[in-house]
C-alpha cells in the first residue's frame, strides 16, 4: 500500500505513555518518483532526537514531496534509540553499545544492495539528517 507508514504507527503516538511499542523497528521508508526512474540519485534521511527518541514515521519526515519535485529516491530508516540502541556495559556482550549505529549501517548496506531494483543508483547516495541524525551522518563517513 502506498502512502502508508509501516507498521501503521503515525509517530506522534510515541509521546503517549500508553502506546504499545516494540524493539522491532528495523524498517525503511522508500519514496520513488513516478514514473519509476532509471539510475536516480538516492537521498537517505536519518532523523534526530538526541539518540533518545524519534521515528522516521513522523509526518514532517514524509519524503514524497522531495522525491516527486526533485526526481530523487528518498529513503528514511528507523533505528534503536535510548538504552536499546546505545546502552554500553563494558565487558558485557549483551550491551556492547552503539547498536543504533549498527542498525543505521545495516540500512545503508541494504540500500546499496537493493536500491537499483527501485530505480536508484547505488553509486549516487547522499546521507542527510538533523540533530542526532546529522551526527550519525558524520559517524558513517
Curated annotation (Swiss-Prot):
The reaction(s) catalysed by this protein are: an acylcholine + H2O = a carboxylate + choline + H(+)
Positions modified as Phosphoserine?
A: 131
| Residues forming the catalytic site | 131
Coiled-coil ranges per UniProt: none
Residues bearing carbohydrate: 39
Q: Which residues bind substrate?
A: 49-50
| Signal peptide limits | none
The alphabetical list of record keywords is:
Disulfide bond, Glycoprotein, Hydrolase, Phosphoprotein, Secreted, Serine esterase
Q: Cite the Pfam families for this sequence.
A: COesterase
The keyword Disulfide bond appears for this protein:
yes
EC annotation? 3.1.1.8
GO MF, one term, reads: cholinesterase activity
Q: Does the keyword Transport apply?
A: no
Question: What family is this protein classified in?
Answer: Belongs to the type-B carboxylesterase/lipase family.
Function field: Esterase with broad substrate specificity. Contributes to the inactivation of the neurotransmitter acetylcholine. Can degrade neurotoxic organophosphate esters.
Quaternary structure annotation from Swiss-Prot or TrEMBL: Homotetramer; disulfide-linked. Dimer of dimers.
Name of the protein described by the UniProt record: Cholinesterase
Origin organism is Sus scrofa
Amino acid at each position: 500500500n502506498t502512502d502508508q507508514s509501516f507498521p501503521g504507527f503515525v509517530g506522534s503516538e510515541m509521546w503517549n505513555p500508553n502506546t504499545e511499542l516494540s524493539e522491532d523497528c528495523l524498517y525503511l521508508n522508500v519514496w520513488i518518483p513516478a514514473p519509476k526512474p532509471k539510475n536516480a540519485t538516492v537521498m537517505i534521511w536519518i532523523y534526530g532526537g538526541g539518540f533518545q527518541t524519534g521515528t522516521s514515521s513522523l509526518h514532517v519526515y514524509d519524503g514524497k514531496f522531495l522525491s516527486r519535485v526533485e526526481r530523487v529516491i528518498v529513503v528514511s530508516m528507523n533505528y534503536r534509540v535510548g538504552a536499546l540502541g546505545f546502552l554500553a556495559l563494558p565487558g558485557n556482550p549483551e550491551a556492547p553499545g552503539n547498536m543504533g549505529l549498527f542498525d543505521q549501517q545495516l540500512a545503508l548496506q541494504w540500500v546499496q544492495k537493493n536500491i537499483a531494483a527501485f530505480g536508484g543508483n547505488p553509486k549516487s547516495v547522499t546521507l542527510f539528517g538533523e540533530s542526532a541524525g546529522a551526527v550519525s551522518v558524520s559517524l558513517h563517513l
